[in-house]
Curated annotation (Swiss-Prot):
GO terms for biological process: proton motive force-driven ATP synthesis. PANTHER family: ATP SYNTHASE DELTA CHAIN. It is found in: Cell inner membrane. Gene3D superfamilies: N-terminal domain of the delta subunit of the F1F0-ATP synthase. F-type ATPases have 2 components, F(1) - the catalytic core - and F(0) - the membrane proton channel. F(1) has five subunits: alpha(3), beta(3), gamma(1), delta(1), epsilon(1). F(0) has three main subunits: a(1), b(2) and c(10-14). The alpha and beta chains form an alternating ring which encloses part of the gamma chain. F(1) is attached to F(0) by a central stalk formed by the gamma and epsilon chains, while a peripheral stalk is formed by the delta and b chains. F(1)F(0) ATP synthase produces ATP from ADP in the presence of a proton or sodium gradient. F-type ATPases consist of two structural domains, F(1) containing the extramembraneous catalytic core and F(0) containing the membrane proton channel, linked together by a central stalk and a peripheral stalk. During catalysis, ATP synthesis in the catalytic domain of F(1) is coupled via a rotary mechanism of the central stalk subunits to proton translocation. This protein is part of the stalk that links CF(0) to CF(1). It either transmits conformational changes from CF(0) to CF(1) or is implicated in proton conduction. This is ATP synthase subunit delta. Keywords: ATP synthesis, Cell inner membrane, Cell membrane, CF(1), Hydrogen ion transport, Ion transport, Membrane, Transport. GO terms for molecular function: proton-transporting ATP synthase activity, rotational mechanism. GO terms for cellular component: plasma membrane; proton-transporting ATP synthase complex. It is a peripheral membrane protein. It comes from Fusobacterium nucleatum subsp. nucleatum (strain ATCC 25586 / DSM 15643 / BCRC 10681 / CIP 101130 / JCM 8532 / KCTC 2640 / LMG 13131 / VPI 4355). Belongs to the ATPase delta chain family. InterPro entries: ATP_synth_OSCP/delta_N_sf (IPR026015), ATPase_OSCP/d_CS (IPR020781), ATPase_OSCP/dsu (IPR000711).
Length: 174
C-alpha cells in the first residue's frame, strides 16, 4: 500500500517535470529501463539497496548506465535514489504510465483467444474497441487453449467473456 502511494506521488511530480521539458517518452524509457534492470539483475538490486555502499558510488554507476543519453533526465533517477525510493521504482513507473495513458487517451486491453489472430483480425478488434471507447487501444493478446473457442476481453475492470468454456459452464449450471 505504501509503495503504491509513493509511486503515485513521485510519478505525478515526475510526469509534470517531463511535460515541462517535453521529455515524457524519454523519461518513461529511462525509468522503465531502470525498473527492468532493478527487477532482473540481482547484483544491481543488491548494490542499489545496500546501505553500506555510499550513494556517490551508486550515482556513479547510474550515471555510467543511464547518463549517456540525457544527463539532465538522469537527475530524476538520482533524486529517487537520494530519497531511498529505488525499491518503489516498479510502482513509480506503473503510475507514470497510467498518467501518460490517461492524458493521451490510451486504453490497455488484454484479450485471450484459443489461437493467434491474423493482423487483419487484430486491426478489426482494435478499430472496434477504439470506436466503442473513443480511445487509442494498446492490445495485448494471450493464447489459452483451455477456453475452447471464442475469446475473453479485459478492459480495465470490465471482462467480456465470450468463450465457449463460459458457455459450457453456464449450460451445466442451468
Amino acid at each position: 500500500m505504501i509503495k503504491s502511494q509513493v509511486g503515485r506521488r513521485y510519478s505525478k511530480a515526475i510526469f509534470e517535470i517531463a511535460e515541462e521539458k517535453k521529455q515524457v517518452k524519454e523519461i518513461y524509457e529511462m525509468l522503465n529501463s531502470a525498473m527492468v534492470l532493478y527487477r532482473t539483475d540481482k547484483e544491481f538490486k543488491h548494490f542499489i539497496l545496500n546501505p553500506l555502499i555510499d550513494n556517490e558510488q551508486k550515482k556513479s554507476v547510474l550515471n555510467e548506465i543511464f547518463g549517456k543519453d540525457n544527463s539532465e533526465n538522469l537527475n530524476i533517477l538520482l533524486y529517487i535514489l537520494d530519497k531511498g525510493r529505488m525499491n518503489c521504482i516498479k510502482y513509480i513507473v506503473a503510475e507514470y504510465l497510467k498518467i501518460y495513458y490517461r492524458k493521451n487517451r490510451i486504453l490497455d486491453v488484454k484479450a485471450t483467444f484459443t489461437k493467434e489472430l491474423t493482423d487483419e483480425q487484430k486491426k478489426k478488434l482494435i478499430d472496434k474497441l477504439s470506436q466503442k471507447t473513443g480511445k487509442e487501444i494498446n492490445l495485448e493478446i494471450k493464447i489459452d487453449k483451455d477456453i475452447l473457442g471464442g475469446g475473453i476481453i479485459k478492459i480495465g475492470d470490465k471482462i467480456i467473456d465470450g468463450s465457449i468454456r463460459r458457455e459450457l459452464d453456464n449450460w451445466r449450471k442451468s
